[in-house]
């Protein structure tokens, strides 16, 4: 018996990186999962791998109609919804404000925020009625960039900070029917895409030169995470039996970013 036996989840951005790791872990814990993503080939591959434990919905989280359709498909296939996981996001390749041309700013801002903030809110809005009925939960993927500077550029860090407010306000608005929590991963070996056109060097996060070494050296645990290492937190927060009184909380899964200290001391194995 898994922690999520017979539960139903909807995961956005579920075709790669942390998203697909969550989907696989939820299935292993006994859940049925609806997976929303933009890439038809990746959705098909995940469906072939996991069979009738999942359904897939191709769509764009920035569009209300697509979020509504994903929830409707979940209810049609599985009869209810217990957990909504907002996970879709894009990166900004550490682009500073003064490196964004003024004539490009509005487009870049709207593109990133439409996915990284608006997409979470639209998904939450679409899922609310079903989650009220099941007295379920919402879980949002944040980042250590939701709390600290330097983990991205101005747009990414601002958007992730905004999600802290989203979690707190939704937890307030939706109580006592729906629990709302988040997971804030640190540096992770994930192919999260950078915003197209924002930076001529933009590549997936795990292909940025020096990313893994630099990020590992910055935290006390001295390594970056694989996507699977974060998934236990999503299982815990979705579990009524184990987190039934947990709401408005964010679990940090970042290798100890907060306790880096102000000096240059190196953490060594003993």
Which role does the model predict for each range below?
Residues 8, 15-17:
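Conserved glycine-rich cofactor-binding loop
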Residues 40, 59-70, 228-229:
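The beta1-alpha1 cofactor-binding region of Rossmann-like NAD(H)/NADP(H)-dependent oxidoreductases
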Residues 90-110, 152-155, 264-269:
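Conserved mid-core segment of classical short-chain dehydrogenase/reductases
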Residues 101-121, 139, 156, 163-164:
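Catalytic Tyr-X3-Lys loop
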Residues 121, 130, 223-252, 258:
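C-terminal substrate-recognition "lid" of short-chain dehydrogenase/reductases
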Residues 129, 171-176:
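Alpha-helical segment proximal to the catalytic Tyr-Lys
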Residues 143:
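Residue(s) in the substrate-gating loop at a strand-loop-helix junction
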Residues 175-179, 245-247:
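Short, small/polar-rich loop/turn modules that mediate ligand/substrate recognition or access, typified
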């Amino acid at each position: 018996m898994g922690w999520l036996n017979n539960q139903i989840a909807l995961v956005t951005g579920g075709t790669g990186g942390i998203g697909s790791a969550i989907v696989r872990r939820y299935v292993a814990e006994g859940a049925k999962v609806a997976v929303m993503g933009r890439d038809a080939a990746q959705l098909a591959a995940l469906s072939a791998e996991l069979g009738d434990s999942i359904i897939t919905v191709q769509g764009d989280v920035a569009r209300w109609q697509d979020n509504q359709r994903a929830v409707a498909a979940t209810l049609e296939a599985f009869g209810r919804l217990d957990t909504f996981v907002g996970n879709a996001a894009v990166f900004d390749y550490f682009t500073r404000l003064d490196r964004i041309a003024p004539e490009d700013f509005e487009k870049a801002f709207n593109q990133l925020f439409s996915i990284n903030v608006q997409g979470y809110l639209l998904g939450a809005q679409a899922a609310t009625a079903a989650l009220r009925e099941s007295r379920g939960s919402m879980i949002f993927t944040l980042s250590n960039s939701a709390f600290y500077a330097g983990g991205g550029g101005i747009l990414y860090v601002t958007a992730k900070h905004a999600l802290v407010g989203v979690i707190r306000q939704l937890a307030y608005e939706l109580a006592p029917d729906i629990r709302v929590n988040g997971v804030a991963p640190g540096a992770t070996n994930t192919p999260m895409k950078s915003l197209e056109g924002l930076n001529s060097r933009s590549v997936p996060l795990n292909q940025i030169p020096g990313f893994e070494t630099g990020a590992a050296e910055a935290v006390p645990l001295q390594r970056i995470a694989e996507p699977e290492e974060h998934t236990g937190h999503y299982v815990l927060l979705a579990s009524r039996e184990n987190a039934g009184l947990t709401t408005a909380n964010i679990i940090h899964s970042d290798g100890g970013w907060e306790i880096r200290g102000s000096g240059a001391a190196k953490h060594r194995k003993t």
